[in-house]
Amino acid sequence: MTPIVFIDRDGTLIEEPPDFQIDAYEKLRLVNGVIPALLKLRDAGYHFVIVTNQDGLGSPTYPQASFDGPNALMLQIFSSQGIVFRDVLIDRSWPADNAPTRKPGIGLMVAYLQDRDIDWARSAMVGDRPTDLQFAENLNIRGFQLRTPQFGGDWDWDGIAHTLADAPRRAVVQRHTKETNIRVEIDLDGAPQARITTGLPFFDHMLEQIAKHAGISLHISAVGDLHIDEHHTIEDTGLALGQAVRQALGDKRGIGRYGFDPPQLPWQVSGAAAHGGFTLPMDETQASAVLDFSGRPYFVFEGTFVRERVGDMPTELVPHFFRSLCDASGMNLHLSVHGDNDHHKVEACFKALARALRQALQRHGHVLPSTKGAL
């Protein structure tokens, strides 16, 4: 799905003159900061649509020819800098006409409201007047009013681009079945913290390792049919957590994508190069994790456990949890562990995954890390 920034023209893309008509080339001036802001938003995956009221356009007081020349030059300037508008929607009515197509009315938006490929949750409206904010409210999207001497406002283009392109990656998932009721709240850019309650204290402790060592904020509340056994609770928690990660990542622009973290220290942990992933020791145990947010879920596990359970967590459900996480998140994960102490082995698996996640989730600009154009 594609997010769209709907943009007013006069006073937002170009400076508005005292007579409120840009009908001559000498009146054409770009608003400060608009080009770098739109480039940043473009690189973050946004499309652009101009929505503008042009009072009486085509009438004797505002001839079409007087509008066309400066408007074409404006579009050419933006195009020369790599900024292309998906559409230019113009209402030509007078304010007294109360036309439904005139902002803040949304009559010009019928085709867009029927488009199922628009990401409305991330879309926004940018303008310089209160009517632009009302237009945004009517569309149920976020509105930004540029700061101008004529109409006030609180925003500049740099702040708008930062807010939209660098928005925190958050998600809330509620998974409710006849067997479990699970709520996951995740913030991939939040301060590392965990609040976990699943009814399985050892499992809670393992999930806390993900939040701590991946550097994310994670809240999980799970109520399951533990009177039967632990399977449904652990499996569905993995599915809900994976769904939340996938949702928070959005279109994955700018992420590292891969989690492998090759050794960068002056010494090398034994076996790290051979495993090719993030490798960590825990006493006699060593675990390695390498992952890819490819959108193609796959899980490979190498390791064995001697004990039937560690604490209240069956060891057979350790790889099953990771498989569920991969299935729901679209992640490819290769995880291996060897050692003597099963507690250490389970905990090392969760910590190795978390450290690989930390690298894969990091932002590096806004470029999509794929030649296919989608992940």
Swiss-Prot record:
The active site is at 8 (nucleophile), 10 (proton donor). Its EC number is 3.1.3.15, 4.2.1.19. Mg(2+) binds at residues 8, 10, 128. Residues 1-168 are annotated as: Histidinol-phosphatase. Pathway: Amino-acid biosynthesis; L-histidine biosynthesis; L-histidine from 5-phospho-alpha-D-ribose 1-diphosphate: step 6/9; Amino-acid biosynthesis; L-histidine biosynthesis; L-histidine from 5-phospho-alpha-D-ribose 1-diphosphate: step 8/9. Residues 169-375 are annotated as: Imidazoleglycerol-phosphate dehydratase. It catalyses: D-erythro-1-(imidazol-4-yl)glycerol 3-phosphate = 3-(imidazol-4-yl)-2-oxopropyl phosphate + H2O; L-histidinol phosphate + H2O = L-histidinol + phosphate. One of its GO terms (biological process) is L-histidine biosynthetic process. CDD domains: HAD_HisB-N, IGPD. Keywords: Amino-acid biosynthesis, Cytoplasm, Histidine biosynthesis, Hydrolase, Lyase, Magnesium, Metal-binding, Multifunctional enzyme. One of its GO terms (molecular function) is metal ion binding. Pfam families: Hydrolase_like (PF13242), IGPD (PF00475). Its cofactor is Mg(2+). PROSITE patterns: IGP_DEHYDRATASE_1 (PS00954), IGP_DEHYDRATASE_2 (PS00955). SUPFAM superfamilies: HAD-like, Ribosomal protein S5 domain 2-like. GO terms for cellular component: cytoplasm. It is found in: Cytoplasm. In the N-terminal section; belongs to the histidinol-phosphatase family. This is Histidine biosynthesis bifunctional protein HisB. It comes from Xylella fastidiosa (strain Temecula1 / ATCC 700964).
